[in-house]
């Protein structure tokens, strides 16, 4: 579960940052 949460956070950060 924690791994998935990290993936989601990364994705959000990427979109934002991008």
From Swiss-Prot:
The keyword Secreted applies. It is found in: Secreted. The keyword Secreted applies. GO terms for molecular function: toxin activity. Its main location: secreted. One of its GO terms (cellular component) is extracellular region. Keywords: Neurotoxin, Secreted, Toxin. Expressed by the venom gland. Belongs to the scolopendra toxin 3 family. This is Scolopendra 5920.47 Da toxin. The lineage of its organism: Eukaryota, Metazoa, Ecdysozoa, Arthropoda, Myriapoda.
